[in-house]
């Protein structure tokens, strides 16, 4: 079983904000594959389905971003999911808007959701799908990440989200991670 985790903050005030990029991508993936995130427990909403013959668990923590690990680790334990079968979808300010980047391990890079997952899971060796939101030009970081995409930014983000969903499809299908990085980064 593969586990795809989207990072974001809960509550309608955070819907469609840059920091909820992970939620938006996993929602698109789940919708494309008819996976309903109807189970609510272990500080998360999740659902599962078959994608290309592989069972996939799609997870959205219901904690705030900086406590995401509190949801991820218990779900991994409950479903006996190996860290090698986990992909976390996150926003990344260090990537230009519209770029995606896959990594098979690494530090949190200042992302508090990733930092929490590393702390709870006990390793940095899990997959990341980073979706670029760019650096703020005129806003503080907090105001920027909690703000919504502008009218000009939204189509660029939508294209990146489509590529991210395609990358998730290829990952679930068992594509070699190095090949995925070469194809999508």
From Swiss-Prot:
Keyword Hydrolase: yes
Enzyme Commission numbers on file: 3.1.1.29
Site (Stabilizes the basic form of H active site to accept a proton): 91
Pfam families to which the protein is assigned, alphabetical: Pept_tRNA_hydro
GO-annotated cellular components: cytoplasm
Biological process annotations from GO: protein quality control for misfolded or incompletely synthesized proteins; rescue of stalled ribosome
Cited InterPro entries: Pept_tRNA_hydro, Pept_tRNA_hydro_CS, Pept_tRNA_hydro_sf
Site entry (Discriminates between blocked and unblocked aminoacyl-tRNA), positions: 9
Catalytic activity: an N-acyl-L-alpha-aminoacyl-tRNA + H2O = an N-acyl-L-amino acid + a tRNA + H(+)
Active-site residues per Swiss-Prot or TrEMBL entry: 19 (proton acceptor)
Protein residues bound to tRNA: 14, 64, 66, 112
GO molecular function: peptidyl-tRNA hydrolase activity; tRNA binding
Keyword Cytoplasm among record annotations: yes
Main localization, broad class: cytoplasm
PROSITE patterns xrefs: PEPT_TRNA_HYDROL_1, PEPT_TRNA_HYDROL_2
Keywords, in A-Z order: Cytoplasm, Hydrolase, RNA-binding, tRNA-binding
Subcellular location: Cytoplasm
Protein function: Hydrolyzes ribosome-free peptidyl-tRNAs (with 1 or more amino acids incorporated), which drop off the ribosome during protein synthesis, or as a result of ribosome stalling.
HAMAP family linked: Pept_tRNA_hydro_bact
Subunit composition and interactions: Monomer.
Matches recorded under NCBIfam families: pth (TIGR00447)
Family the entry assigns: Belongs to the PTH family.
Protein name: Peptidyl-tRNA hydrolase
Species of the source: Levilactobacillus brevis (strain ATCC 367 / BCRC 12310 / CIP 105137 / JCM 1170 / LMG 11437 / NCIMB 947 / NCTC 947) (Lactobacillus brevis)
Biological classification of the source: Bacteria, Bacillati, Bacillota, Bacilli, Lactobacillales
Name of the gene encoding the protein in the UniProt record: pth
């Amino acid at each position: 079983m593969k586990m795809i985790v989207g990072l974001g903050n809960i509550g309608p005030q955070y819907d469609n904000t840059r920091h909820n990029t992970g939620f938006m991508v996993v929602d698109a993936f789940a919708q494309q594959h008819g996976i309903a995130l109807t189970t609510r427990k272990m500080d998360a909403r999740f659902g599962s389905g078959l994608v290309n013959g592989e069972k996939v668990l799609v997870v959205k923590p219901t904690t705030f971003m900086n406590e995401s690990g509190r949801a991820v680790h218990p779900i991994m334990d409950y479903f006996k999911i190996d860290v090698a079968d986990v992909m976390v979808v996150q926003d990344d300010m260090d990537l230009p808007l519209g770029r995606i980047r896959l990594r098979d391990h690494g530090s949190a890079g200042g992302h508090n959701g990733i930092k929490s997952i590393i702390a709870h899971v006990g390793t940095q060796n899990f997959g990341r799908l980073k979706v670029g939101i760019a650096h703020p030009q005129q806003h503080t970081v907090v105001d920027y990440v909690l703000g919504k995409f502008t009218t000009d930014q939204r189509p660029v983000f939508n294209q990146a989200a489509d590529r991210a969903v395609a990358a998730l499809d290829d990952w679930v299908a068992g594509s070699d991670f190095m090949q995925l990085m070469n194809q999508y980064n």
